[in-house]
Amino acid sequence: MTCAALLFRDTRSVPEKINLKVDGTLPSTMNLARNFSIIAHIDHGKSTLADKLLELTGTVQKREMKQQFLDNMDLERERGITIKLQAARMRYIMNDEPYCLNLIDTPGHVDFSYEVSRSLAACEGALLVVDASQGVEAQTLANVYLALENDLEIIPVLNKIDLPGAEPDRVAQEIEEIIGMDCSNAIRCSAKEGIGITEILDAIVTKIPPPQNTAISPLRALIFDSYYDPYRGVIVYFRVVDGSIKKGDKICFMASGKEYVADEIGVLSPNQMQVSELYAGEVGYLSASIRSVADARVGDTITHSSKRAECALPGYSQATPMVFCGLFPIDADQFEELREALEKLQLNDAALKAVTRFSMQFEPESSSAMGFGFRCGFLGLLHMEIVQERLEREYNLNLIITAPSVVYHVNLADGETVECSNPSLLPEPGKRRSIEEPYVKIDMLTPKEYIGPIMELGQERRGEFKEMNFITENRASVVYELPLAEMVGDFFDQLKSRSKGYASMEYSLIGYRESNLVKLDIQINGDPVEALSTIVHRDKAYSVGRALTQKLKELIPRQMFRVPIQACIGAKVIASEALSAIRKDVLSKCYGGDISRKKKLLKKQAEGKKRMKAIGRVDVPQEAFMAVLKLEKEVL
């Protein structure tokens, strides 16, 4: 049967069977509820499949449909990726029974794996979507392992079978060999063309188990997401694990101990729709006029104030930031606005961590060059870029972001070990005994013809080769252990460039190792610029210092005096450039006369320049800072 025939068959049968509006009514029993998520490597068609499920179940009318319907942020549509998990409730009729399907959409990029883990904790099953033309990718494996840790029922789906290069049989065999999952009944579909969508919906109903029915137990609901609404306060997304919750209930957040009244509860279909009550196994939202972002944290447990649960739900493992940088407002008057924006964004983005001294207080970071800002931690470079863009777009802030760094362990001479993520706070060489840096294990999947360039990249980044396995005849897994600091620059871009876009990667932190690291300072006219300081391996210090000094020479405006630009390790200058002085022609009005008059004018000019150099201050323009910080990200 041709693709056209398959498409005709599906689109004719689906409306008669399942084109029903969601009305907010609850299934008569929890046996009719199914909670599932979609997991996939980035760009394998996950958001397109979610769109088609929403359309064909009648959850969203065709005239209201748009690409990446669940991706609410402009950033997500512009980049074509999912950043935030989203939830949607669908209704599907099968064997004359109205099933309630709760979809929790997940991101696919490695930086947002924490969002994936939160989604999976609220589900009983998952659709594993694999591109039939590309096969198993690195993040596919990582997502499968997350699903297995949560003991989920996994349904393999081979997407994009309409592409000319699709090889569903080969990809099914790949999944069996690499993951060890039976793919004899893997669903073959094309989310774009609507092929196989009915089979996916049927499989969700028949293969994914319903939630456990514990409706008579005290209320326990797990918060898996939240965001701040300026009119309604904190809006909480949760899954009811035990008991039930209805509008008007007095509730308590077990971690914070704060009590509120549930002003509004409802379901996400995918827009918010009020209902009177939610039962065990269901997914919904809650509004209770919560004004403090600290009162309702992701991973907390909701229970009734009058009949509290004995113990809270396990929640989630804390996300560990791997990359740190400074965020500074270009306009110093926006410092407090930046603080408020970070607090609100942290509520919605639980993986964003501002470095704190005390619980729930941001630690300001000051710089003589850029003023006051904050030191923040991120899961990766993409996560860092997304947070910066969200702050600028959603909160109208203009920001400078410093070069990213990782968390180092500094062993001091007195035997104490301290953590350092800010190069300007690194203890002096005389006070420290050694520095340890974080290492990661990176698994790169690549076609066999690009193995050489991929291994060269690993060696260039101080990597240690561990193993190589051919997962199929034409694709190999290359495993390296390398410093995390070598990945926070352009590693991913280089990986894609050297493999012509075909390689993918997945990494995990494996611990700390001692390295020969030094602090590289940049001095302009003898004054250190803290914002440009960085920690580098001694072998790379000269090349990084040379690149930074040359870039600064291009960007800093010339002065009336000579300005030296130096890269230093301690008191030792390892790279130097100089801005030549702008020379004023003081002899232009001397049309003759005694030579001593000219010598006197030249001597006076030289003395003035010497005095100016001693007391003069070189202002580095913001454009120069931004260009050099961008260069640091590339050369580190």
From Swiss-Prot:
Pfam families (UniProt xref): EFG_C, GTP_EFTU, GTP_EFTU_D2, LepA_C
Domain tr-type G residues, every copy: 31-212
Cellular localization per UniProt: Plastid, Chloroplast
GO biological process: positive regulation of translation; translation
Gene Ontology CC annotations of this record: chloroplast
Top-rank EC class of the record's enzyme: hydrolase
NCBIfam families: lepA, small_GTP
Function field: Promotes chloroplast protein synthesis. May act as a fidelity factor of the translation reaction, by catalyzing a one-codon backward translocation of tRNAs on improperly translocated ribosomes.
Name of the protein this chain belongs to: Translation factor GUF1 homolog, chloroplastic
EC number: 3.6.5.-
Family: Belongs to the TRAFAC class translation factor GTPase superfamily. Classic translation factor GTPase family. LepA subfamily.
Entry keywords, A to Z: Chloroplast, GTP-binding, Hydrolase, Nucleotide-binding, Plastid, Protein biosynthesis
Other remarks on this protein: This protein may be expected to contain an N-terminal transit peptide but none has been predicted.
Reaction equations catalysed: GTP + H2O = GDP + phosphate + H(+)
